[in-house]
Amino acid sequence: MLQISHLYADYGGKPVLEDINLTLESGELLVVLGPSGCGKTTLLNLIAGFVPYQHGSIQLAGKRIEGPGAERGVVFQNEGLLPWRNVQDNVAFGLQLAGIEKMQRLEIAHQMLKKVGLEGAEKRYIWQLSGGQRQRVGIARALAANPQLLLLDEPFGALDAFTRDQMQTLLLKLWQETGKQVLLITHDIEEAVFMATELVLLSPGPGRVLERLPLNFARRFVAGESSRSIKSDPQFIAMREYVLSRVFEQREAFS
C-alpha cells in the first residue's frame, strides 16, 4: 500500500503542495487530476523519490520513501528512451544496471514487449517507432523490474485520439493482469474518469486535495464491457461533466 500523510512541498520557497493525504491499495488505479499549477507532476516526482519533500511522509509497503527505488516504475510523457539502443535493450536497461545476467534480462524484456503488443520489434530502434509504440516501450521498461507501484506522468498527452484510446485500454488490461498499484497523472478529464478506481481532484495554489471520487468504469472495462459503450453511458457522461465543472471552478477561482 502507498500511504501519503500530511505531505508538504515547496519550490524555491513557494508552497506547491499542502497537507496531501492519500492512500493507494494494492490492485487499485488512482488518477490525479487538476488544472495547471496544482502540483500533479510534483506529487509524482515526490513519490518516485526524484525530489525531496519538506514535511510529512510517503510510505510504500510500510517503508518510507527517501529516494528512487526499483519498487517504483515510472513512465513519462516524453518516454525518456535511449535512441542509440534498440527496443529490447531499452526495456532491459534497468535490469542491466541492477546486475541481472544478460540472457535473463533479454528474456524478461521479450516477455514485457509481448505484454504490450510489441513482440517482433525487439531489434528496431526508437526512431523507427510511432508515438504510441514508444510509449509501449516505456511501459514495458517500467514493468520489467516488476515494481510494486507503477507511476505514469501524463503518458498519453502527446498522442492522437485514436492512439490514446488504444493506450488507455492497454494500460487497463496490464493493470488487471499484473494486479499492480497504479498512479496516473493526467490533464485529460475523460481519460481520468474512464481509468480511475479513485479519482483525486487537486486545487491549485498550492495543491490540495479538493475531492476524492470512487469510480467503477475501469472495472467495467476489464470485466468485458467495451470502452465505447462505457464512454457513451449517461452515467459516464454525467460524471465527466461534473468533474469538468469542478476543474473549471478551480481554474476560474485562481485565474
From Swiss-Prot:
It is an enzyme of class 7 (translocase). Its main location: membrane. It is found in: Cell inner membrane. SMART domains: AAA. Residues 2-229 form the ABC transporter domain. It comes from the Bacteria. It is a peripheral membrane protein. The keyword Cell membrane applies. Keywords: ATP-binding, Cell inner membrane, Cell membrane, Membrane, Nucleotide-binding, Translocase, Transport. One of its GO terms (molecular function) is ATP hydrolysis activity. ATP binds at G34, P35, S36, G37, C38, G39, K40, T41. It catalyses: taurine(out) + ATP + H2O = taurine(in) + ADP + phosphate + H(+). Its EC number is 7.6.2.7. GO terms for cellular component: plasma membrane. Signal peptide: none annotated. The keyword ATP-binding applies. Part of the ABC transporter complex TauABC involved in taurine import. Responsible for energy coupling to the transport system. Belongs to the ABC transporter superfamily. Taurine importer (TC 3.A.1.17.1) family. The complex is composed of two ATP-binding proteins (TauB), two transmembrane proteins (TauC) and a solute-binding protein (TauA). This is Taurine import ATP-binding protein TauB. The gene is tauB.
